[in-house]
A protein has these predicted regions:
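Active-site signature of cysteine proteases
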Residues: 1-108
């Protein structure tokens, strides 16, 4: 996940949203469920390290607006399967390479 984000930008991940998560207002989130169910999609845009606690975390953007979380974003602990964030991720990769020899035509 880190390599993909570093090289190509944000990735899409499914998570198991809970009532507790809906109330998130800041900090590094941590919640693991015994039987998770993916029910929401978010964009993982980066990662970091809290040096005070030596905790690695993902930085993700939610779709609930800037009033929620950390101005629409949240941090969630890495490597502990929190909300199943590391189980169901995808990255968009173009299936073509532009050919510079071909001219693009625009019609009006």
């Amino acid at each position: 996940m880190k390599a993909e984000i570093y090289l190509n930008g944000p990735i899409s991940c499914g998570i198991d949203v809970t009532d507790k998560f809906e109330e998130y207002a800041g900090g590094i989130y941590s919640e693991k469920k015994a039987f998770p169910l993916i029910n929401h999609e978010i964009s993982v845009v980066g990662y970091g390290l809290d040096e005070a606690t030596n905790t690695e975390y993902w930085i993700a953007r939610n779709s609930w607006g800037t009033y929620w979380g950390e101005r629409g974003y949240f941090r969630i602990q890495m490597h502990t399967d929190n909300l199943s964030i590391e189980r169901d991720c995808t990255a968009g990769i173009p299936s073509f390479t532009p050919n510079k020899a071909q001219k693009t035509q625009f019609y009006q």
